[in-house]
């Protein structure tokens, strides 16, 4: 994790490292158990900053119900590292019968987004460049494993779980479409994009669908299960704004595409982003 700045509204590099690894495991259908953490520290980093970050990691691990079982530190010369980098690894257990994978997306499934889109990326950019948007925004960083575990236990028939971090919602859905060989149709009117994110994105020439998120999960499951899944997800603070944003329309093989029905009723192709829109956001 190399996020810049290391402290920002809604979180810091410490809880981001824990939440990111926990969510990666949870989106495989696993119950996260143990994490390791390796720190690369720049010479001169204030010990108070390191202590603050480690305490943040401790709180995030406790909230997620995981243990940090090993760690290591290395110090490099000033200028060889920007303040602090963290490397984490995690181990979890996938319960019997769980089969979560991008290629499981099936025509007739719907796509549920667990919350507001674009908060983390815009918050980081604003804090880094002192743009002032952070007065209205904060990162959505959160661990989602407890909610996901309850979803899998209660609903059972969940086909795909993905956290739309780098590449955003668009990049993640394009990867799913290619892996499963299916077309995905989004409804622009249903996208939960906060007005502050929309305004900041327009000002900066960015598309919220390509902006990274750190407390969001995309859930793909049969439409018949959505009515049961949505109230369950909304019962958790981190997914209380869960909503259906699209559906899997047809099997398309190598021609799989992501499209969006716009507010004006026409259709737009949502391609993979070429290059990286915002570096060092996680």
Which role fits each region the language model picked out?
Residues 1-113, 119, 124, 133:
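Glycine-rich phosphate/pyrophosphate-binding loop regions near the starts of catalytic domains
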Residues 21, 57, 173, 197, ...:
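Aromatic/hydrophobic pocket-lining residues that form π-stacking "cages" and hydrophobic walls in ligand
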Residues 28, 61-62, 77-83, 102-106, ...:
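Solvent-exposed alpha-helices and their adjacent loops that cap or buttress functional pockets
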Residues 32-34, 65-67, 83-89, 109-112, ...:
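Structural motif
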Residues 42-44, 137-213:
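Active-site-proximal betaalpha loop/short-helix elements
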Residues 147, 229-232:
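Hydrophobic side chains in well-ordered alpha-helices
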Residues 221-226:
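Helix N-cap motif at beta-to-alpha junctions
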Residues 235-282:
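Acidic, Ser/Thr/Pro-rich beta/coil linker or hinge segments at domain junctions
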């Amino acid at each position: 994790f190399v996020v810049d700045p290391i402290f920002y509204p809604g979180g810091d590099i410490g809880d981001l490292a824990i939440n990111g690894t926990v969510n990666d495991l949870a989106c495989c259908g696993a119950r996260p158990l143990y994490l390791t953490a390796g720190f690369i520290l720049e010479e001169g980093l204030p010990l108070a900053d390191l202590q603050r970050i480690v305490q943040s990691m401790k709180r995030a691990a406790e909230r997620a119900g995981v243990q940090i079982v090993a760690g290591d530190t290395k110090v490099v010369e000033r200028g060889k590292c920007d303040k602090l980098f963290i490397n984490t690894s995690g181990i979890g257990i996938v319960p019997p019968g769980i089969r979560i994978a991008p290629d499981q997306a099936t025509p007739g499934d719907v796509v549920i987004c667990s919350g507001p889109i674009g908060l983390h990326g815009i918050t980081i950019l604003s804090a880094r460049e002192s743009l002032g948007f952070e007065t209205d925004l904060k990162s959505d960083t959160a661990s989602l494993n407890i909610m996901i575990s309850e979803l899998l236990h209660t609903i059972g028939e969940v086909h795909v779980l993905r956290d739309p971090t780098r590449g955003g919602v668009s990049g993640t859905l394009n990867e799913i479409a290619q892996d499963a060989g299916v077309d995905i149709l989004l409804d622009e009117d249903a996208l939960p994009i906060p007005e502050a994110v929309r305004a900041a994105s327009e000002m900066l020439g960015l598309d919220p669908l390509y902006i990274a998120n750190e407390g969001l999960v995309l859930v793909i499951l049969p439409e018949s299960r959505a009515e049961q899944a949505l109230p369950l997800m909304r019962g958790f603070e981190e997914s209380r704004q869960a909503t259906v944003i699209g559906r899997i329309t047809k099997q398309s093989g190598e021609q799989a595409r992501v499209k969006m029905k716009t507010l004006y009723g026409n259709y737009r192709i949502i391609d993979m982003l070429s290059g990286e829109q915002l570096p060092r956001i996680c």
